Amino acid sequence: VQSPEDWERDELKKMPLTEDQYAEFLGIEHFYPPKGFSPLESLRFAPTLEFNGMGGGYQGEGSKTVIHSEAFVKITCRLVPNQTADEITRLVKEVIESRCPPQVRVEVKVTGGGDPYVVIPPGKPGADFDSPALLKKAFAAAENRIEEAFGTHPIYLREGGSIPIIGDLKRVAGLDSLLIGLFTNEDNLHAPNESFHLGIMNKAIDAFEKFFLDLVDR
């Protein structure tokens, strides 16, 4: 697993969120981050093995003396640079199958995946030495227009996501992607009662209009 650069850790410290606030938001008392990472760093920089859902047996109201014959669990993995979806899928499948007791049958179904993608802002440690001129222009324009619209400089963070096509765009077409996140914790992203702040949306529309005009050769 590739360790983050010092400048990335410094960027994370600019987030207006403390570990205590995040624990309260999650409703937990303790974190268990991997070695070498703080809780908030592990959220941004470390790979994951996530249990998204479990089921089996009677799940209705009250009790029932039923011994179920099947159970399932849905898992996902967030990957980081130097990992590939095929390799991690193989390793996870091998571990699950190797630890299955002989009295139990296990079946692992793979439904999809994508390789990780990260783009380092030109000029930062870890960035490509020969960053394309358009990429440099895009980062500069994004910084200027976001700061103009929101009154604060953007923070560069890694964010877990499921957009495999951006990795394919880089691999096949050699094109980088600039992803701009505008959600807040209160938005309940991909959860019940998901929302998006209209004030943020209006500022973003103005910023993006000017951003795309900045990229045009005029």
For every predicted segment, state its role.
Residues V1-S195, G199-E209, V216-D217:
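Metal-dependent amide/peptide-bond hydrolase catalytic core
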